[in-house]
Amino acid sequence: GGFYNVVTKKPTGNTKGSVTLNTGSFDLYRGAVDLDGRITKSNKLIYRLNVAGQKKKFFTKYNNSNRLVVAPVLTYNIDSLTAITAEYTFQGSSYLSNGNYTFSPKEFADPGIANDFFYGDPGMEPGKLRDHSAYLYFDRKLNDKWKFHAQAAYFNFDMKATSTWLNYMTAEGSMPRYYSTADEHGENKFGQFSFNGEERTGTIRHRILAGVDYGNKKFWGDFSSLLPVIPGDPLNVYNPVYG
């Protein structure tokens, strides 16, 4: 419970690694590397590194999406009862359109509109998303029944993207579109600590969790329509000409 829960691959202290490659429909290519090991022979300092990248297109024309994730984790085992773990995650993404809308002047599932019809425009600037996350964990085993856990997190998010939207549609399937842009930034700070354990009263076992959460969330967003109507001929859903 609490403000946030994050599940990331943690160091195990065992030296191992893996490489994964995938491919699929619509020019999907995905690769991932997972490295797990120790920096000191005593296993006091251990690490985990995950890197993944993806490049793909869509069933609609022109649309595409590229992603990159880098997630290093470092754990310092102070002693057999105490550990500190630091994590960082970077997520980067670029895409032409986050979604695709199809409009028809006739009916739902209009057979005259191609399945790969793209509502946006290949001449648009791709949207870019950058997300940084940092975590710090402290764990202490107090005795055989009780544990103390503390964690802090910092999130930093930026997104800049453009999009097109329908103004109206004619009976012939032409739709003048307007052009808009979005510039977003988010910054979140979280803290949490808890005691977790159990006690008995006679034959009854009590499992106890007590803690405190702190959160501070900030978001800035600027959304505007740059052009009330995109210059040039309106896009026609039956014969789309882009540019």
Which role fits each region the language model picked out?
Residues 1-70, 78-82:
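Outer-membrane beta-barrel translocator/receptor signature
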Residues 9-34, 203, 212-243:
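Outer-membrane beta-barrel transmembrane domain signature of Gram-negative proteins
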Residues 19-23, 33, 49-55, 72, ...:
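Transmembrane beta-barrel strands of outer-membrane/channel proteins
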Residues 33-37, 72-76, 136-140, 191-197:
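Residues on the lipid-exposed face of transmembrane beta-strands in outer-membrane beta-barrel proteins
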Residues 40-42, 77-81, 143-145, 196, ...:
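Outer-membrane beta-barrel channels and translocator barrels
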Residues 54, 58, 71-141, 147, ...:
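Acidic/polar loop-and-plug regions of large Gram-negative outer-membrane beta-barrel proteins
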Residues 80-96, 198-231:
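Internal hydrophobic scaffold segments of catalytic domains
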Residues 105-114, 182-188, 192-194, 198, ...:
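Solvent-exposed loop/turn elements at secondary-structure boundaries
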